[in-house]
A protein has these predicted regions:
Chain A
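Hydrophobic core
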Residues: 14-20
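PEST-like low-complexity, intrinsically disordered acidic/proline/serine-rich tracts
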Residues: 2, 20-246
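Bacterial N-terminal signal peptides that target proteins for export
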Residues: 1-14
């Protein structure tokens, strides 16, 4: 026979588990349902309308990790400083890479199935088809690419995405945030009860960094938004403007 | 079932860590424009490019010497504008508009548009605020 405190504890645990289930949407197989249109920020998530009113939000229940400076090795730090914003690959409409793509001020849609998760980004028409594979096994024929190769597994309620196979042409975040082909990114997508996703990305690159670097974002659902076409090169005068400045 | 209020109370920060976003979505605003001083231009729209990665519209306005300058006004990408309620049909060739904007650092006749006042007096934002604090002469 259980004692009263133990019984209360068991009831509390049971209630908490029910509460978790009730507060986030789940798929038929019980996983958090990440599907939908999300955005990491920008233009106040479309509240900056005619009168300049910006949307405001309650504090998130699960804030993302605080971003620290990138821990570069000395040579890499020096090299990083040789770049200006005119060198930004995205200025030329090139793919933003991971994790930077998540910070672009444009929406993306997550389409989740039991076997794979697809992310379709408005920015630069990027897409990722991410197989769910508990061993996080990448193909053995990878050649370096802008967005790398992604595989995922569920860690409890968090979707963990392992990304490797990058080229060395993207930036991690701001101006000059270089990396090597040894870049390895581990992302976590955690759906929260306040209808946000806490996104974090842990970046390792032993050739360039002294230790792992973590960044993150709080993803929200921009209202009345669908992912649309963004043909960046269409009228891209920015390279010319920025090169005049350089 | 209640959202855990306790967690909310414990959290002080607002969460957007990736806040150092390129303000014009695609390139560095601060590198290209004088981000702390606004200018106001009133003139006639001569051309509209509702294009990516940024829209441009062109406005004929007289400078202090009475010479007509054709200003190129850059704004957000079309999708972004549409989502804030600024549509392609809002910019009509021949309309007289007033634009508050930031001048290009290279002294060209390019502007980063901020607020547009249309012929009926209504106002919409074409692009971002440049400085950390909203300029006092923005209206």
């Amino acid at each position: 026979m259980t004692t009263r405190p133990l019984r209360y504890f068991a009831i509390a645990v049971f209630s908490a588990s029910l509460g978790l289930a009730a507060t986030i949407p789940r798929t038929a197989d019980g996983k958090p349902n990440l599907s939908g249109v999300w955005q990491g920020g920008g233009v106040s998530l479309y509240g900056d309308a005619a009168d300049g009113t910006q949307r405001t939000y309650a504090a998130p229940v699960n804030p993302p990790p605080k971003r620290e400076p990138i821990p570069y090795q000395a040579w890499a730090e020096a090299k990083s400083k040789t770049f200006t914003s005119a060198d930004d690959p995205t200025l030329r409409c090139l793919l933003a890479g991971v994790p930077r793509i998540t910070s672009m001020p444009m929406p993306f849609e997550i389409i989740q199935t039991p076997k794979e998760v697809v992310i379709a980004y408005e920015s630069f028409h990027a897409f990722r088809i991410i197989p769910i594979n508990d061993k996080l096994q990448h193909p053995n024929d990878l050649v370096p690419t802008w967005m790398g190769d992604s595989v995922a597994r569920w860690d409890g309620d968090a979707l963990v995405v392992d990304v490797t196979g990058f080229n060395d042409k993207t930036w991690l975040s701001g101006t000059g945030s270089i990396h090597s082909e040894g870049l390895h990114v581990v992302e976590r997508f955690q759906l929260n009860s306040d209808d946000t996703i806490t996104y974090s990305a842990t970046v390792t690159d032993p050739k360039v960094l002294t230790k792992a670097w973590t960044t993150g974002a709080l993803l929200r659902r921009p209202p009345n938004t669908r992912v649309e076409e963004y043909e960046c090169i269409e009228n891209n005068q920015d390279v010319q403007h920025m090169e005049v400045k350089k | 079932m209640k959202i855990p209020i306790r967690n909310r109370l414990l959290i002080a920060c607002s969460g957007l860590i990736l806040s150092a976003l390129p303000v014009l979505a695609h390139h560095s605003f601060a590198a290209e424009y004088e981000s702390k001083s606004l200018v106001t231009v009133t003139g006639v729209i001569t051309k509209v490019e509702w294009t990516n990665p940024h829209i441009y519209f062109y406005v004929d306005a007289k400078d202090a010497s009475g010479n007509v300058v054709n200003w190129a006004v850059e704004g957000y990408p079309p999708n972004t504008l549409k989502r804030t309620g600024f549509t392609r049909d809002d910019l009509k060739i021949g309309d007289t508009v007033t634009v508050t904007a930031y001048k290009a650092k290279d002294s060209s006749s390019r502007l980063a548009g901020r607020e547009v006042t249309f012929p009926d007096g209504s106002k919409k934002f074409a692009g971002p605020a440049g400085g950390a604090a909203p300029p006092t002469d923005a209206k």
